[in-house]
Amino acid sequence: MFQGAVALSLDAKGRLAIPARHRDALTPDGAPLVMTVHPHRCLLVYPLTAWEPIREKITSLPGMDQATLSFKRMLVGFAQEETLDAAGRVLVAQSLRQFAALDKQVWLVGQGTHFELWSDAGWQKQQEAMLALVDNPLPAGLENFVL
């Protein structure tokens, strides 16, 4: 279970040091992890075993409609398998860094089965958008949710 948000830094080569507490779950037995893009201009970071059923679902989507094709191209087309180096770092491909506008400071945000990787500016903007929703009714299924 991946949870929490932590500010991290990309090094000059575009590598990200994965926090030690998440390494074994993210890359069990040295398995690769998968990074791909999200339409909100962040990256998704999955253990390979969690990504594979998602990829299968996406690639089996029927359709010649533009929305389905674009969805497939985005999520599967940008997907990259990467392995951690001996220091627990993973290279974030230039194409992915460019898509998500990642600079030196980034945010790794747990989402249960995976992480989101945000630029500092993108994460700040996302937090402001979440706070703006406070005055709106909760979405279906969360009406009775109490913290």
UniProtKB/Swiss-Prot annotation:
PROSITE patterns: SPOVT_ABRB. SUPFAM superfamilies: AbrB/MazE/MraZ-like. It is found in: Cytoplasm, Nucleoid. Residues 5-50, 79-122 form the SpoVT-AbrB domain. The keyword Transport does not apply. One of its GO terms (cellular component) is cytoplasm. Its main location: cytoplasm. GO terms for molecular function: DNA-binding transcription factor activity; transcription cis-regulatory region binding. Keywords: Cytoplasm, DNA-binding, Repeat, Transcription, Transcription regulation. InterPro entries: MraZ, MraZ_C, MraZ_dom, MraZ_N, MraZ_sf, SpoVT-AbrB_dom, SpoVT-AbrB_sf. The keyword Transcription regulation applies. It comes from the Bacteria. One of its GO terms (biological process) is negative regulation of DNA-templated transcription initiation. PANTHER family: TRANSCRIPTIONAL REGULATOR MRAZ (PTHR34701:SF1). Forms oligomers. Belongs to the MraZ family. This is Transcriptional regulator MraZ. It comes from Azoarcus sp. (strain BH72). The lineage of its organism: Bacteria, Pseudomonadati, Pseudomonadota, Betaproteobacteria, Rhodocyclales. The gene is mraZ.
